[in-house]
């Protein structure tokens, strides 16, 4: 049955591809925009002022929040860290409350990050695993998730989209990493033993569309390829894909100094599994690091 889907962050890389996929499946997509709406497929909102069209939320079957400032920025900047947090938490809180106050209570697919888990070393991480650590992105992800809870408390179906880096040549991080690798500068981070979760764009889009259409899916979902490589394995696979060698390494101390608040994400390990999605019947097209890279580079 065709759905009415409202998306915040529809103009972003993930949001635009998700919108295209949903429309291809005959669903109607309305984008929340922070400017005057140009068509019936847009609706103006201002999350920082708590302004939105209640009728749009009431008329939705599914609301998706992918809004948020880029994670790429100056990791030593307090302004960057503040925008990173507020752009995610505020938009999620406003939409969760809007859903809670609506009569129909549409499903809420709330963006989140795998940083919620924190560093777990080699331990296999599923949706049942706990959050640990106190890194910037882990703290933000916890607040981000908490902001979505009012929707579930009011009885709405809530799916938390725990997303790792999405590998596609048109977007970070693969866009930058393939250029560096082509120059022969591919380098593992530290000793390269840390697990590095990822997903192809087509699987991320496919999984989120699957959750939008699934009438009973709820809870956290790890949207990642089923076989999580180490950083060294990823670096070698990318080098092979562009016919180069990966012989370099960035020392741990250099990453800690240069990456600032993002160093824990570069050096931490999350051996992630998409257990909840696979239990529901979603089948990944790209299951290994090699498949993710080949699809992302195509």
Positions of predicted regions on the chain:
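Conserved beta-loop-beta element that borders a ligand/cofactor-binding pocket
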Residues: 112, 146-169
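C-terminal amphipathic/interface module of NAD(P)-dependent oxidoreductases
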Residues: 264-298
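Alpha-helical substrate-binding/gating segment
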Residues: 178-186, 194-228
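Conserved Rossmann-fold NAD(P)-dependent oxidoreductase catalytic core, especially the SDR/UDP-sugar
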Residues: 92-134
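Mid/C-terminal beta-alpha module of Rossmann-like enzyme folds, strongest
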Residues: 211-261, 294-297
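NAD(P)H-binding glycine-rich loop region in Rossmannoid oxidoreductase-like domains
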Residues: 37, 41-91
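Glycine/proline-rich active-site loop of Rossmann-fold NAD(P)-dependent oxidoreductases
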Residues: 142, 154-156, 167-176, 211-221
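N-terminal Rossmann NAD(P)H-binding glycine-rich loop of SDR-like oxidoreductase domains
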Residues: 5-25
């Amino acid at each position: 049955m065709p759905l009415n889907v409202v998306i915040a962050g529809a103009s972003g890389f993930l949001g635009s591809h998700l919108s295209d996929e949903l429309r291809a499946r005959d669903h109607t997509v309305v984008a929340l925009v922070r400017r005057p709406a140009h068509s019936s497929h847009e609706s103006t909102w201002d999350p920082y002022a708590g302004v939105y069209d209640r009728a749009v939320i009431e008329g939705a079957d599914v609301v998706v929040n992918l809004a948020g400032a880029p994670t790429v920025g100056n990791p030593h900047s307090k302004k960057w860290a503040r925008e990173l947090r507020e752009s995610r938490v505020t938009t999620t809180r406003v939409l969760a409350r809007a859903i809670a106050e609506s009569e129909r209570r549409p499903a809420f697919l709330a963006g989140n990050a795998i940083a919620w888990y924190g560093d777990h070393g080699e331990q296999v991480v599923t949706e049942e695993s706990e959050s640990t650590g106190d890194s910037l992105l882990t703290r933000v992800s916890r607040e981000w998730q908490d902001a979505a809870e009012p929707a579930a408390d009011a009885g709405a179906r809530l799916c938390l989209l725990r997303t790792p880096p999405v590998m596609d040549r048109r977007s970070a991080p693969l866009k930058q990493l393939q250029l560096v690798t082509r120059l022969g500068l591919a380098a593992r981070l530290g000793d390269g033993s840390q697990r590095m979760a990822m997903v192809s764009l087509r699987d991320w889009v496919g999984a989120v569309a699957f959750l939008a259409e699934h009438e009973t899916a709820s809870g956290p979902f790890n949207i990642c390829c089923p076989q999580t490589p180490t950083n060294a394995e990823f670096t070698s696979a990318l080098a092979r894909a562009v016919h180069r060698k990966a012989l370099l390494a960035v020392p741990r101390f250099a990453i800690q100094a240069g990456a600032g608040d993002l160093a824990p994400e570069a050096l931490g390990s999350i051996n992630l599994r998409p257990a909840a999605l696979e239990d529901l019947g979603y089948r990944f097209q790209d299951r290994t690091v090699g498949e993710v890279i080949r699809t992302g580079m195509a």
